[in-house]
Amino acid sequence: MKLIYTEMSYSMTEILVNEARKAADQGYRVFYIAPNSLSFEKEREVLTLLPERGTFSIIVTRFVQMSRYFTVESSPSKQHLDDTTLAMIFYRALMQLKPEDLPSYGRLQNNSVFIEQLVELYKELKNAQLSVHDLTGLDHPQKQEDLIKIIELAETIMIQQDYNQDSPLQSFARAIKLGLLNNQLSKTVVVIDGFSRFSAEEDYLLSLLNNNCQEVIIGSYVSQKAYQKSFIKGNIYEASLHFLQDLAQKYHIKPVFATSNQVFKPAFSRLTQLFEATHDFSQVDWQLQKNDLDHFSLWQCHHQKEEIEHVAKSIRQKLYEGYRYKDILVLLGDMDAYQLQIGPIFDKFEIPYYLGKAEPMAAHPLVQFIESLERSQRYNWRREDILNMLKSGLFGCFDDSDIDRFEEYTQFADIKGFTKFSKPFTINSSRQYPLDFLNEMRQDIVLPLQELFKSQKQLGASLVDKLILFLKKIRLAENMQGLAQSQLEVEKNEEVWKRFTDILTSFHHIFGQEKLRLSDCLALIKTGMKSAQYRVVPATLDVVTIKSYDLVQPHSKPFVYAIGLTQSHFPKQIHHSGLLSDQERARINEIRNYRHFDIASAENSKKNHQTALSLFNAATKELVLSVPTVINETFDDLSPYLKELINFGLPLLDKGKNYLSYDNSDIANYKALLSQIIAINRQDLIEMADQDKMFWTGVLRYLRKQLRKQQLELPTSDYRLSTKPLSKEVIEVCFPKGIPLKLSATALTVFYNNQYNYFLKYVLNLNKTESIHPDSRIHGQYLHRVFERLMKDHTQEPFDNKLKQAIYHTNQESFFQQVYQDNAEAEYSLAILEDIVRSTAPILQLNQNIQVIDQEKNFQLDMGNEILVHGIIDRIDQLSDGSLGIVDYKSSANQFDIGTFYNGLSPQLVTYLAALKQIAPHDINQLFGAMYLHLQDPKLDLVTFKQIDNTLVESIYKALTYKGIFSEVEKEHLSTGAYQTKNALYSNDELETLLNYNKYLYLKAAKHIKKGHFLINPYTSDGKTVQGDQLKAITRFEADLDMGQARRLVTLPAKEKKECFLTLMRKESHL
């Protein structure tokens, strides 16, 4: 064995490549070993350093791949053992054990997390060269007993099913120990680069290779100063020193110092020396030189998005200077936090990149389909799971529009659970769903699922056969082929499909002769699919490489950007979680030789120093280290390592907001420039410097000129939210000439509430999702129907009997039976409605001086100027003197307010008066009013009553009164009825004013509607809060930002309020 170390200013790869070339020139076969995470990059680096740029004598690979070169022909033809297969084997082993057999883990037998931990422990034992019987000294002896039972049973199953229990390295080591590879290894030289520690498995293999190979050469970075130190605790080279010292002591050799022809920039060497002096308690009498600072940058940004944008702009600048994408490396402090943001931003700046991290398959449609299938079976046909299966695009041959219609109906009819899915759809609504088509679709969905889900506990082989038959019926394979739209998607689909078929094969192999339930089968398949990952290879070598910073090696690229280096992530604190604690691992390691667990937490300090050292030397030309003040929406501090660099004299540059400028990095890329022009068009120029204002104003002026030539424009508005008028063609279709515009009191109220709401409801005809469950609309229909029946009954029956009959016959109507007898909640709602009817009905019995002459009266009111107002009057009453009035039933409290009417928000009663005047063409003297009747079950606070007497009854009836607009002429006739006339009496002239102003409201609204421009203007009564419908989800209206767009209501003092509003009405309606 030969141990080589060198300073950070030299290239260890060049030194080892020279050693490899010498061996190859002598006729030896050379294996150049690199860590798993670096083998691809190391291969490219090694081939670059070879004069001939390639050779068959030097193979750059990993330990695992090297073992296959030697054992591929002699390895036994056994089944491959991966993580999913291991999980299935442990699941089967736990199935065969009873809870009382496992005192410590009996309650976790079916826990998926526990099974994952068993898989990890088993793999750790293999890597550590340990068996389960070596787990002595655990905190609880029963833990070892339980683990022995589980793992021994699992290993028995592996033997029975002919699975290969040995890892590739174990098979390689066994072949070496048996002398099967002596001739080959005697002509082999092994060169190892990039390691600072070996696992127990690698350590054991290395001892065998050292005894059998021609030579083993290992290189590592250690400074001469550090190598001569006797005390190395806390030294930045501590990990490498321990690594070399352990090997030197074990193999009785002395490491040699070597240098390379390539020497990197002195700036990085000087920074490394300062870093080393800080941690080895020595001092230096010099500082970084001024020109050294040109190679380092410390950035501080506010948040991640700005940080990534600054990096992207800097990369564009490097390209402008003539560098290539492959010369740039981006390192992430927190891979999970940055992974979702960095892709879209790099795409915006047109920067091709390769993210060096396996991508989980969890978002693939096949994985989502399997998960939805398993949940559908487990949760008894839950609607969301059935719909997710359909939306995956892998179930049957359904168009998106068909799936949308099916989803809409199942939500309306509240279809959930097997019982409802298995029965034909019969309930319909005003939208007239195509029940015949939906039932055909329901059968296509239900029949294959029902056939699969009815499977009882049986052999695993039989379950797999039924599952495959189900997948054929729904055309899963054909649908998978239709998913791909690009070559990358085709490759991903192939990986997912292979993973899926491998899992089915493993399940059939392991559980083929075991009886288990379908739910267990689907759960195991789902777990295997969700844990799988894509292995994507970059389509080209000229890309920006992105990976986690702790995987970096010295001198990786000319330009390196390390971002997200906050205190929480740099350094990283790794803590192991599993079935064994770190303390238990440490006790086991004390009594083993060549066999030991890796304890990450025990090596955090020296590993982090090693990582920081590699990071500070990762670039050969320029290193940028960046930290955001906010990461994952949490404030974080500077890394202690970055604070050290600041103490060395490196300035911390506050990059601030990503302001627009005319630098090459801003305007040299089309997509980035376009996105910035859009951004600047939305913001105020006052945020910029004068020079920037002039530049961007000129750019926008030129852009608008070019857009005008192309008949395009950049919209401008004084408001944050703006709407466009409808085109002439759309206006002609929506509001054709010669056809009256149809309005109603409700439509008018919506218009004056928020014009855009009118556009959505009455122009686009958008409706809220319907539901079979009773809501306020259906409750109102029920109450109207009962009172309509009651008032039509002119028999001599007692009033209470009439009421009972009206309730009974209304409850027997098929629509109300479907609505109110569907479940206990609906039945409870019906009981409340019946109480409301019984409480409100007595008011009808008391008013014996009125006669109901019509109910549910439809009307069409011609307002002139091609405006037709339509509606339904609930009830028309006639007093003893022949005067007419209207009653509108309400399920909530309502009363007429002249101010609300003036602002267009309460036109209903006046509109009904106008319609009644048209229906019964009499003088206005014969109209006694229009009123609301609140259908309610009055609630009284008994604490306010000293005793139960007539005052209690009077209070109940006081709540049951008619409230609205009443003619002053008829007040004598109204005084004997349940009419609340206080402050509600109007003279004939005042009634005429109300009617004329009501017409004016309709004409004004119709004129605006026909223009086709609808504003986002919910009303505000005080200018501080918005009461109108804001439609935030659609309009993004924010009261604090868009108050200027709200319509301010006219409000007047309470004193003389009525007279003042009437005066305004006369003025505006030109009376």
Curated annotation (Swiss-Prot):
Protein name listed in UniProt? ATP-dependent helicase/deoxyribonuclease subunit B
Q: Record's superkingdom?
A: Bacteria
Q: Which Pfam family, just one, is annotated for this protein?
A: ADDB_N
Matching PANTHER family: RECBCD ENZYME SUBUNIT RECC (PTHR30591:SF1)
Organism whose genome encodes this protein: Streptococcus pyogenes serotype M49 (strain NZ131)
Q: Name one GO biological process term.
A: double-strand break repair via homologous recombination
Please give the SUPFAM superfamilies that the UniProt record associates with this protein. Answer: P-loop containing nucleoside triphosphate hydrolases, Restriction endonuclease-like
EC number per UniProt: 3.1.-.-
